[in-house]
A protein has these predicted regions:
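A diffuse structural propensity rather than consistent per-protein peaks
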Residues: 1-2, 69
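An N-cap/entry alpha-helix motif that binds or orients negatively charged groups
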Residues: 2-20, 30-31
């Protein structure tokens, strides 16, 4: 995913991604995301790692040029949740993922 979509790792990882989901509202993500999804968001605080862990999310992509907080990076390393970032918008990345077969 990293090279194919021009993403940059904040926290390394190689978890399998089967699905995709885009939302910035944590409660919605917890209720609707499918396991092994890549989650697109602009949220950067450490609660995204807790949500990812509880929902069995494979990776987080932080969009629109935002950067994960230091506490978030530490939590992601501890929980083995890869975080990537991009300057691209959520809509653009979602479209690219969809076209590649991640739905």
């Amino acid at each position: 995913m990293k090279d194919k979509f021009g993403l940059e790792y904040t926290v390394q990882g190689d978890n399998e991604v089967v699905n995709g989901y885009a939302s910035d509202l944590l409660s919605v993500v917890m209720g609707r995301v499918k396991p092994q999804s890549v989650w697109l968001t602009v949220q950067t605080h450490k609660n995204i790692v807790a949500v990812a862990k509880m929902a069995d999310i494979s990776a987080i992509i932080i969009c629109d040029g935002f950067t994960a907080d230091d506490d978030t990076v530490e939590a992601a390393v501890r929980e083995n949740i890869p975080i990537l970032k991009t300057e691209k918008g959520t809509f653009e990345i979602a479209g690219m993922l969809y076209e590649s077969g991640i739905k």
